[in-house]
Every structure is written in structure tokens, then in C-alpha cells.
Amino acid sequence: MAKKRVYELAKELNTTSKRLMEKLEEINIVVKNHMSFLEEDELEALYDHIGVIRHKDDKSNTDDNKTASAHSVAQHSSEAMKELKKEAKKAPRIIRTTEIYLDSKDEEIKEIKANDAKSQKKPEEKRKKNDFVRVETETSGLRPGLVRETKPEYMRILEEQKKSEASKAQTNEKKDAEKNSVKEVVKKEEGSKQTAEIKDGSVNMEGKVLEEVKATVADSATNVNLNESIDKDKKTNDNRQVSTDNSAVNNEENAADTLNKKDMDKKNNNKKNEAKKNAEKKNEAKKNEKNDNKGGNAKKNEHRSPDMKKNDSNRPQDANKQNSKAAADKNREEGRTGSKKSLEIPKVELTTSQKEEFNSQRAERREYNKDAEKDSKRELRKEQPRSAISGGRNKNHKVIKNVFNSRKGVSEVLSDDFEMDDFYFGGSKKSRKIKKKKEEKKEEKPAPPKPVVTSIKIAAPITVKELAEALKKTSAEVIKKLMSLGIMATLNQELDFDTAAIVADEFGVKAEEEVVVNEEDILFDDSDDPNDPEAVPRPPVVVVMGHVDHGKTSLLDAIKKTNVTEKEAGGITQHIGAYMVKINNRNITFLDTPGHEAFTAMRARGAQVTDIAVLVVAADDGVMPQTIEAINHAKAANVTIIVAINKIDKPTANPEKVKQELTEYGLIPEEWGGDTIFVEVSAKKGVNIDYLLEMILLAADMLELKANPNKQAKGTVIEAKLDKDKGPVATVLVQRGTLCVGDSIIVGTTTGRIRAMTDDKGHRIKKAGPSTPVEILGLHEVPEAGETFYVITDEKTAKQLIEKRKLKQREQLLKASARVTLDDLFNQIKEGKVKELNIIVKADVQGSVEALKQSLEKLSNDEVRVKIIHGGVGSVTETDVTLAQVSNAIIIGFNVRPPANVIDAAKKAGVDLRLYTIIYNAIEDIEAAMKGMLEPTYKEVVIGHVEIRQIFKVSGVGTVGGGYVTDGKITRNANIRLVRDGIVVHEGKLGSLKRFKDDVREVAEGYECGLSIEKFNDIKEGDVVEVYVMEEVKE
């Protein structure tokens, strides 16, 4: 195979070069243009791809293969079949319905052209255009030796069937022609004989029946012989003899017709005689019909000819059509062929005399109708509304095509009454009277009274939805009632018992509070009986409150005569301390709450567990904001307040001014007619300390403080922390009962068994009575400060309660998490784009964590919002660093020292880790960080002016102005304004700044320079360039 160019190959294949190049690209063969050569392997690949089949000139080989394959097919040997399969794989297969031959001058193709030219019109014109294209033939694409059948097997079968049907039709036509010829001959020969017999009147009704039976037998025999004679084309004389018998029957019919005409004339003349003989003829007709039905039908069916059987198929089979034509013709024939007396047959009402022909389906239907009537009669006996419907049925029943014209219940549809009445008998077409009776019966039934709610039991709190369900009202009705009462409530809003009782009363329902027994009621005994005979006096719990640096801890130090203040960092109390002081053989428990505003929550908890509050006010400072807050907390907790005016030893002290200021807040001294005890003390010098203690004991006696030490122990957690060696440690104040080592307690969401107890002086104790502060060990987790603890005995119920509390706490955390909800979306829109400062707080005790949280959250402003994403007790861990890295937060450690690996991890992650021992420093640093996050405020500062005196145009640079610095200085990359005649022409930046040929950073006043402006060339002599910078304004 020689090389070929693309355009040459395109001509041979009768296509375009572009199309060929596209086909070559499909098989990854790239050619430059239509003049490129194609190698032999490329041609082979292209032929295989586009379906071109090349045939060789060796015909002998193909002939040998054909003969060999044909011989192998004839033998059907296994070895030959294997060889055929191998050859079939190698043989060329047709890819398209048109084969393309490149060797168009071969003799074989010429022969094919000659053969095709005979069958096609104008073959010369088509072959001149493309001689190499040949249409698919019988042998194309097949194995050698095999020929494709032009007509499949099923086509042959269809043609054979058509041929056989055509031959049958021809034979039938011959039969009919021969029959007609035979009948005409027989009619002429036998016509006279038949008429003579009829005139004599010797044939009676019974003889007629016998003759008809003989005639049917003879007719069937003649048909059989006639078919044989037509098939064999012999014995024509015999066929004529047999056909005479067949024609006799037809001749009798014609004679009967002529006789019928004569009889009709006689009937018209003798009508009077007919009326007399009606009764006798009726009886004869009945007898004949009975004989016909009993014996005649069976014999006729057995000996009927094929033509008669064909006619039977067209007869109506419905027995209900009693006046059918077949029955009437039958009666006429019986009358015509009888005796003279019986020939005068009157018109008989066949509808009453003739019986129904037997039919098995009709008999079943008749039995079914009888059963239905019996069922209806049974239903009439029952006292049911359906009985009236079944009794009014119509006997002419019809099946209803569409039964979906009325609604029925499932029980009614599945009942037998529906199937009988509605489906078969047309239950939808009931009489109006029945419907009226049914409606009257329905109206007679009394409607059941609606349940009226008179009283309900509800548990407080209850949601609006639950209240509506209890009242059997809709939620909308309950909400409307609440709105009329001035309460705007939603569907899931909780209502207290009093509000729910008022709403129920508005609906005329009496509400009773349901007693709900939960795990807390089982575990805890919260009943406090003031007249308990086992109650004994207990020490008072005193809390010292006041402003920062007013001397609270110094007063406690003076009372305890121990130096506590020096131990605190910066001299400020950081934790709640609980101490017991013995005065005159009586104990007093002191709680020292920090005075800083950050510890508001801690101070609120301290006020809740105390009996007396000592308000410390400095004589020189007077009432401060934290002092007012302390007064409010004490009043909210209903605590007796004793005012201690401290620092009276100072020369600037003014106790009277302090008393005057406190009267504004409801604290009036006794000497001024009030009920508040005022004591002037000096904690530093110990002045009037004993008198203050006596006043505390006096107030305690007035309160008559008692507690039952034998009850279930109950108390409050004052402080809790996580100790490295001891684990979770909690400082608790026992308020009731006696706490012992080994008791199991439950605090919030944690439990534990007390392993050890120590008092305020560090001594190990085994029991702690009411109003005793102790430090306990053995809890599983660090509890929250302010939680109430109980001693429990049923640990199983306690675990269930803890699971409930944890679930509730988890729900609250999910609600508090910053997720976008429909309720919170409006608030976020109002806030706009708010920057957040994420902070992680770690402290040594829980109280400090809460104090830092509240202090830092108060620093939030309109542009920056402080968000405490995590707060916990203990040192900073690597987990905290990871959380800070992910959430872009800073870590604040208070009184904790992180290990070296945590500090390294924070440095690698770029997390800001800050450690503090005094809370003021932490707050100040956070404020500075927040100011850094605010968008800075800039102001414009003019640093100099340049007067343009000469202009130079430099290729590649543009216009350069030579100027003189009149004042200030000019710096590179500074902002400039080009002023021309007092009008700002352009604002931009300096592109370059030079002095002579050197680039300089700045040019001072009194020097010349050359400058260019970025993206601006319209500089003219006399312009003034104003140079300025933007400086940040510190807040």
C-alpha cells in the first residue's frame, strides 16, 4: 500500500479533506494540511475507524474457503464448527450498510454492477458518479460459504397460509355452484309429488315430526358425501341421487308457502268457525310444544347439518325474550305441515304459553334473585333503618356501573347489605319516603351532651398551650383572654399558677394546683418549722460589705486579731473567706465578700446566706457606688444592716456626713429616731471593735436564730476550686442539720462522698453543725459557687436528678450559644457589623472567674463586644490554647501559672496569653486592647508647600516640575494637593522626588527640588503643591 495524500484519499472516498482530517484527529493522527502524506499504518487505522473494507484479488482463495465452509456446514462436525468460528473472527464484518471498495476496476465489481443495472432504473448515471460504492448484498459481512436468506422463515409461513386460504376459497365456490345446480333439478322432479300429498291431507302432526327427523339425518349424510365428491371429482350420479333427498325438504317448504296462502283465504271466509275451535287448538298447541321441548330438541341438536348449526349460533340465547321470531316460526311450521283440522291455527299469545329455554347461567341468576328476596324479607323483620331500603327493591334489577355517588363508612361497605342493596339493586335510587323516614329516626336520637370542664388540676408553671389543652379551648382563645387581662403571651410562654387560675376562672373553670412529686421532693427536706422542739440556737452568719479600700478586711483582721490583708495580692480580698470568731463564749461566723464592683454576683450570694450585714463605710470617703449596691443587696435579702463607720482616726473623717448620706437610702441612726445601728470604729487602731461585736450578738438575739441539728444537712457552697493535690475543694456553710465525714452529698450537677473536713483554722473535724463554715474534699467535680448542697441516702435517685440537671444545663448552654435564630436575627441586624473580642478566662477559684466575666462584659461598647467564650477553674492548658487559636481569642490567667509547654504552644500558635494577680491590671489591659480594635480616627496635617517655577518634559516619565520649598518640608510618597489660583486641581501622591539627579527622601525648607505626580502631567508654572500626611488621633 503506497502513501497517499489527504486530498487524494478524500477524492477516492468521495468526501472532503476537512472531514478526513477530523476523522484522523479522532484516532490521534495529526496532519498539517490536505497535502500531507499518510503512512500505510495510518491508512489502515483510518480504514478501520471509518469502516472501509479492502478486498484482495485472489478469488481462488475465497472460493476455496467458501467450498470448505459449505462442506463443513453440511457435515456439522465439531471440528469444522471450531474452524468456522476461527474463520468468523478473521472474516471482514460489515460496519455500515454500504461497503466502500478502493479497487473499483476489478472484474468482480463489474459483474455486480451489471447485475444491479437490471433491477434499478437509470443505473448508468448513478454508477458514473461513484463506481466504488456498492449496496449491501446477500453475502456481504457473512462467513465464507453462507448466504443470507432474502425472506425469513416467518415470511414463508405467512405466504403459505395465504396460498392455502386462496385454494380453500376456490373449492368453496365450486361447492356452492354444484349445490345450487342440484337443488334446481330436484325441485322440478319432486314438486308435483309434494303438492299431491299436501292436497290429500294425509299427513298429520306426528308424521311431520318423523319426516323432519328423517330429513335431518338424510341432510347430514348428503353433506358428507357431497364434500367427498368435490374433493375427489368423481361419482356425480350418486351425488345427484343423494341431493334429491335434500331437495325434497326444500320443495316441502315451497309447497307449504303456497298452502299458507290458501289457508289465509279460508281463514278470512270462516272467521266464525275459528272462534269456536280456539279452546281445542290451544290444548293441541300446548301438547305439541311439550313434545317438542322434551324429545325434539335433543334429537335435532344431534342430527343437525353444519349449515343449521351455523344458523344456531346467530339465534338469541336470552330466555327472557319469550316472543322471539324463532319460536313463532317454529309454531307456524307445525301448523302448516299438519292435518286439515290442525292447519287452522289461531294467533296464540306465546308470552304465556312458551317456556324458557334451559340455561345454566340464567338458572343461577334466578336462584340468586330468590336468595336475595329471602334476605330482604329477613331484613324486614329486623328493626333497622336498612330494612326499609331492602323491602322497597325493584324486581327488574340492573348492575350500577358507578357506585361512588354517595359516601359510605367502612363498616357499611364491608357489610352484606351494601353489596346486595347498593351495588346490585341501585341503592342510590332510593325513594324519598325512605330517606324521610331515615332522617326522622336520626332526629329522634338525642345528641350526646358535650363534655363541660368545671375544674382542672394544673402544675405550676404551665405553658399557654398546656393550659388551653386542659381547658379544652384553642390556644388563640387563651391568648385573647390573656391579652384582655393585659398579659402579652406566646404559645410556649410559661404562666404561674395564679395567672393560670385567673384565666381558667374567666372561662368558668375552677383551677386547683396539682402537687407534683419529683426527685428533689424525694431527696430533699425543705420544710422549716419555726416551732420545731428540736431546734437549738445557732450562731449568726455575718457578712461584711462595703466599697473598695473602705477597710472591710482590716475590720475582720481586727476582729480575728490575725493579719489576713497582707496575704492577699495588692492588699485586696480576692476570694470569699469564712471565719468563726468566739466572743463571750458565743460563736459568730463572718463572711468577707470582696468590695470591688466585679464581685457583685459573689456579694449577692453572700447576702443570701447571711443573717446580719455589716456595712463598712469610710468616714473620709462617704457613700460610694459599691456602698449603694451593697445596701440594695442587703435589703433584697431582707438582712439586718449594721453600719460600721471606719477610719474615724483620720483627720479628714466626718461621721456625721456619712450618716446624713445614708439617710437618703433608708438607713436612719437610732439616735435620729431610726432602727439602724451605727458604730464608729477604727479597724487600724482597734477602736470600738468589741462594741461592734456586742451589737451583732444583740441583733442576733432579736432575730432568735435557731436550727435543728438532727435534720437532713443542708448548706451553701461559698467557694470552690480545683487543687492540684486535693482535687475539687469546696468551702461550704452548713445552714441546717449536721454534716459528717462519710456523708454523700449532691451539689448542683455533681455528687460525692465527704472524705475530709477542715475548719477555718485548718483543723481536721468530723462534724459540722449549723452556721459552721468548713472546707470539704471528695466531690467528683468543682461545683458552682452559690449552689445548695444536701446530704442524701438514695444515690440511685440522686443520679437521676443529676442527669436531669445536666440536660437542663446543656439546653441553657445551647440557647446561650451564638447561633442565628429568628428571634435573635433582629437583634443582630440592629447591632450591625459588631466586632467581637473573644476572651478565655482561667482563674484559681470559681468566684474570680465570674468576677472577671462580669467586669469584662461591662467593657462592651457600640463598636466592640466582649465575649467570654470559656471560663474555668485551674491552670491554662493546651486545650485552652487550641480553642483560643481557632476562635481568635486571648487568654487571661488570674492567679494561675501555666506550665512551660503551654507557654511554648501559645507562642507557636500566636495566641496572646496574659497572666495577672490583681484584677485592676487585667481590666485596664483589656480596655487598651479594645481601643486598638476600634477604627482609628485620622486627621490631616500639612507638612509643607512647594512652588512650581519651571516645567520639564521627560520622555518615559512625563511632566516634571522644578520647584522651591517655601515652608515646612516635602517627603517622598506623601499626599499632595495641586492648587492653581486658589482652586484645587488635583489630589494624589508624589511619584518621585529628586534634588539635582539624586533621589531623596525629603527636601527641607529653602531648597529646590524636582518632583512628579502619579498619573498626572498637567503641571504648570505658578502652581502650588501642598504636601500633607494623615495622622492617627489617639482616643
Curated annotation (Swiss-Prot):
Location of the protein in the cell: Cytoplasm
Domain tr-type G: 537-706
InterPro entries, A to Z: EF-G-like_DII (IPR053905), EFTu-like_2 (IPR004161), IF2_II (IPR044145), IF2_N (IPR006847), P-loop_NTPase (IPR027417), Small_GTP-bd (IPR005225), T_Tr_GTP-bd_dom (IPR000795), TF_IF2_bacterial-like (IPR000178)
Region Disordered: start-end pairs: 56-80, 114-402
Region described as G3: 592-595
Matches recorded under PROSITE patterns: G_TR_2, IF2
Segments for region (G1): 546-553
Name this polypeptide is given: Translation initiation factor IF-2
Annotated source species: Acetivibrio thermocellus (strain ATCC 27405 / DSM 1237 / JCM 9322 / NBRC 103400 / NCIMB 10682 / NRRL B-4536 / VPI 7372)
Gene name of this polypeptide: infB
